[in-house]
Amino acid sequence: MSREEDEKLLFPSFAFPAECFPEAATSGGEQKKARQRRRRKVKPEAAAALAGESGGDEQAKKRRLSDEQARFLEMSFKKERKLETPRKVQLAAELGLDAKQVAVWFQNRRARHKSKLMEEEFAKLRSAHDAVVLQNCHLETELLKLKERLADVEEEKAKLAAVAAATTGGGGGGGGGSSSPTSSSFSTVTYHPALAGQFGVEAAAEEADLTYMSEYAYNSYMLELAAAGYCGGVYDQFS
């Protein structure tokens, strides 16, 4: 077999060209055209969605309030926060809006008003909290100062107590020699014969001891005797 025959057996398309099969060629072309038509054809759902989006944009534009309508609704909201159904219908008729649109506007406005009140209340609470924290810091600082002063006072008190204890212990030994004025007012004096002879004292009293009494002790002694009723007897003895 020659080379051409081998190729015809292996590749029949070369042996039988497209002109030999006209029906197959036309059917393939129709399939391609049908595919192109399917690609170009838009689904009804997509078309409806596009139409809905365009209609939604138009409705959104219609729902937008003018400045005058917004001011009128604000004035109405200041007077009454929540509207009844007849009042909503009346406002909608006056403004040329839908009653549902007016109800939604008032609902959103109440939510914004409540949020604003909460923010103001939070600001007040935050300010009060900061003031309390600052006052607490001042009190803690004052407490530390008072603790330092108390420690200084306790230290000074301990020093004074130590000094007082040392003073009391040192003076205890020397305090034993002290005596009352009355007991120290009397002292024994030895009799001197030369002095006694000058004043004419009898020889019998030479061996006696003389007792010296101070003026203060003498006055006290005389007062005690007067209180006991012995003044007359003493003067009688000396008279």
From Swiss-Prot:
Coiled-coil annotated residue ranges, if any: 107-168
Tissue: Expressed in seedlings, roots, stems, leaf sheaths and panicles.
Region (Disordered): 25-65
InterPro entries named in the record: HD (IPR001356), HDZip_class_I_plant (IPR045224), Homeobox_CS (IPR017970), Homeodomain-like_sf (IPR009057), HTH_motif (IPR000047)
DNA-binding region per UniProt: 58-117
Keyword field: Coiled coil, DNA-binding, Homeobox, Nucleus, Transcription, Transcription regulation
Cellular localization per UniProt: Nucleus
PANTHER family linked to this entry: HOMEOBOX-LEUCINE ZIPPER PROTEIN, HOMEOBOX-LEUCINE ZIPPER PROTEIN HOX12
Family: Belongs to the HD-ZIP homeobox family. Class I subfamily.
Listed name of the protein: Homeobox-leucine zipper protein HOX12
Organism: Oryza sativa subsp. japonica (Rice)
GN (gene name): HOX12
